[in-house]
Amino acid sequence: MATYAVGDLQGCLQPLKCLLDRVSFNPAVDRLWLVGDLVNRGPESLETLRFLYSIRHSLVCVLGNHDLHLLAAWHNVERLKKSDTLREIIEAPDADQLFDWLRQQKLLHYDEPRGIALVHAGIPPQWTLGKALELAAEVEEVLRDDTRLQLYLDGMYGNEPNKWSKNLAGVERLRVITNYFTRMRFCTADGKLDLKSKEGLGSAPKGYKAWYAHKDRRSRHVKIIFGHWAALQGEVTEPDVIALDTGCVWGGAMTLYNVDSGEYHRCDCADDGTLRQPAQPTTLNDHT
């Protein structure tokens, strides 16, 4: 039995299958961890969701911002933007089945025996792992609650409040929790978010750092696997922080990581999110 984690899919199914073939993935015995952003912008968002649903018993999945955007568009199609490739999912005959599965997924997963956390964007430096799991559960509970889901999805969008406070309540509380787990890149040591800067580390505003780089980050004892930040190209110097979004949908690569051995496997992608031909997966050592 092997456990793998894969970077942002964003509807790029061919590279995912290329990587799974490369490691002879067997859904009957192996496990696949997904860092979120399963859909959007790539060429096969519907097919990707259907494939994942077909192997759902082999998956651990956390939600990304594009997945939450899909759920919001499912409830209000006017949320769709011109750049989205989500309409085919909303109009699919099996849409309800796929959405019901999607909203059961987590914002943060922790594998206690391995001491590894899986999250889309990150864990803010001021939270312990325990606090992060507690607050993630608040949003996960709402996602699964038919009576509260619509209110959450309608109020999810926005950059404010940009910092956690235990005094926050209602939609504002859920929004800032969501932004930490699904949109964060740069923040201050006390967790004030900058959600405008999306490039590499050199684009950090004054006083801000990558969320994982703060020396007093309270989750340093935990290995964290995350996606979301394609501009990093998987290059993180912090020990026990694994960045897996290598920009497949932008013509980069899709990255698969063996959680136990530390091996990386990459499959190059074309500009449209399909396989770059000829497909030549590569295998790399840990932290390359």
Curated annotation (Swiss-Prot):
Enzyme Commission no: 3.6.1.41
This protein's UniProt keywords: Hydrolase
Pfam families xrefs: Metallophos
Root EC class: hydrolase
Transmembrane as UniProt keyword: no
InterPro entries in the cross-refs: ApaH (IPR004617), Calcineurin-like_PHP_ApaH (IPR004843), Metallo-depent_PP-like (IPR029052)
Reactions accelerated catalytically: P(1),P(4)-bis(5'-adenosyl) tetraphosphate + H2O = 2 ADP + 2 H(+)
A GO term for molecular function: bis(5'-nucleosyl)-tetraphosphatase (symmetrical) activity
Gene3D superfamilies cross-referenced by the UniProt entry: 3.60.21.10
Keyword Hydrolase among record annotations: yes
Described function: Hydrolyzes diadenosine 5',5'''-P1,P4-tetraphosphate to yield ADP.
Family note: Belongs to the Ap4A hydrolase family.
Protein name per Swiss-Prot or TrEMBL: Bis(5'-nucleosyl)-tetraphosphatase, symmetrical
UniProt source species: Pseudomonas putida (strain ATCC 47054 / DSM 6125 / CFBP 8728 / NCIMB 11950 / KT2440)
